[in-house]
Amino acid sequence: ENLLVQLAMENSARTGKPIDQRAIDNVAKEIQQEYYYKYDTSLNGLMKNYPDLIDSREFLRYVHNINYDVLEKDIELREELLRLNVKTYCATNGSKEHAINCMKKIGIDDLFEGKIMDIVDFNFKPKPNPKSLNLMCQKFQIPTNEETVYIEDICKNLSSDAAKDMIKVWFINDEPINNIDKYKDVIDYKIDNLALFLKKIRLLKEE
């Protein structure tokens, strides 16, 4: 769902503002970033370091309490998803509700109905933990080879062992957690327009 939000809004508006309201000093902000780098999500870091204090579901509700009105319908993206006529799924380290809220504003939620797995479904083991993607592939019978195109905005997530044989695509963005030099070898393609990328795939299939 991060990828979908980036199609229509600045990354900082996604989750940064709610977290900043609680991170009232620099130390808290530094801890937040440290946990993200070390544990793949801030929530995962909190759960590992303060298992008796953190309410994971309340945390998800809080950080996803954002203004979705900044998102707009993406008619082109919807059209290409429909015309491509392939199975599509969403794997998110956030909540399913957040992903659905984003998709509703963009106008593609019906195309992913029943095809979303979130951090709760992953037993709070965030991507790139291979257990998460393996769980999703097993549930939806997704091929773990070049038949599957795996698109991510966080290039680290493409390094998952579960995706090693998939076609891996990075949606270009300036998220500070992206270390492109470190993960460049796991990226097969880079894109900055999802609808255009899907259109190119469709045209290749039609040849």
Language-model features, listed with the residues they occupy:
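Asp-based phosphoryl-transfer active-site loop
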Residues: 1-2
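A metal-dependent, Asp-based hydrolase signature
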Residues: 5, 9-65
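Glycine-centered loop/turn motif at secondary-structure junctions
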Residues: 12-18, 50-51, 85, 107, ...
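Conserved short-loop catalytic and cofactor-binding motifs
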Residues: 30-34, 65-68, 87, 120-124
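Charged, low-complexity surface patches
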Residues: 35-36, 73, 92, 150
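Short, solvent-exposed polar/charged micro-motifs at secondary-structure junctions
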Residues: 37-41, 70, 199-203
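Short, acidic loop-to-helix structural element flanking the phosphoryl-transfer center
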Residues: 40-90, 96-100, 130
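Asp-based, Mg2+/Mn2+-dependent phosphohydrolase catalytic module
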Residues: 82, 89, 95-96, 100-207
